[in-house]
Amino acid sequence: MLSDNSALKAHWLTQIAAGEITATLAYTSSARWDDSAITVSAQSFAGGYRLNGEYLYVVDGADCDLLIIAARTPGSIGEAGIRLFALPADTPGISRRQVPTLDQTRRLASVTLKDVELLDEQLLSEPGQGWPMLRDVLRIACIGLAAEQTGGAQQSLDLTLAYITGREQFGRSIASFQAIKHRCADLMMAVECARSASYYAACIATEYLNIDGDPSARQQLAEAAATAKIHASEGFFQCAAESIQLHGGVGFTWEYDPHLYFKRARASEQLLGTPAFHREQLAKQIFGEQP
């Protein structure tokens, strides 16, 4: 949607919107989530580019129909030289492999490119616009992930409340114990903080994507996305971890669901950057070191 390539958007977006194909983003080749993680090379030749390298942590990368990929021209560093491409996942030279992860509910893959040749028409970004465009996409993705994490945190809290209400000890429900109430109150606060941050960030993203929206939304997007990802990541993990504890001895067993939420919370905390990473990004924005 952010690309200036109208032909590519007309071709792919209609199919995505109709549910005919699925698409995913591949850009990082390491455990980092900034521009330094882009190491796949895009060597230009007459009429196109030749790509070589490997992507890691590609969500649904083994099953998707369309890949949106980021690569950099040889010798470029930092934000310079980054290009974005759209290509069918079955393009010759692409190999995909699903990788085992902590979270069985989200499929990740590695995608390897070997002498993959793309035409100039498959380029999504103009020279110099690759990273700014990708950076905004990642911020919007963080907001979407934060909303998912908030829902996971709420569900973790709900299933915990249902369990402790029915669990009796010393002739009474353990939900009536003051210490348990305090812990549940802390979890509710974590969920509400994540929810508020996610709602606000979603409003900012809506303004940014609206052609008639507030022009200042782009400047607010970076701060809102980082704040939402921080609160949602920490809130979800806190709720999932406490859910295991408050379920007692059955909390870590496969017969109960808390372990699924715990794994999802930990994996989602790492995806698109940890809270520590986003705090660093937030500090850079506040001090004017990063747009």
Predicted regions and their residues:
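A generic structural signal for beta-strand entry/edge sites
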Residues: 46-50, 66, 108
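A short core secondary-structure module
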Residues: 52-97
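Short beta-strand-to-turn element immediately C-terminal to the catalytic PLP-Schiff-base lysine
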Residues: 1-4, 43, 69-72, 86-89, ...
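A short, Trp-centered hydrophobic/proline-enriched beta-strand micro-motif
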Residues: 19-30
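Active-site-adjacent elements of ketosynthase-type condensing enzymes
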Residues: 31-41
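Flexible, small-/acidic-enriched active-site or ligand-binding loops
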Residues: 37-39, 57, 88-126
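Alpha-helical interface subdomain recognition
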Residues: 3-8, 15, 19, 45-49, ...
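Residue-level signal for inorganic ion chemistry
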Residues: 5, 25, 53, 85, ...
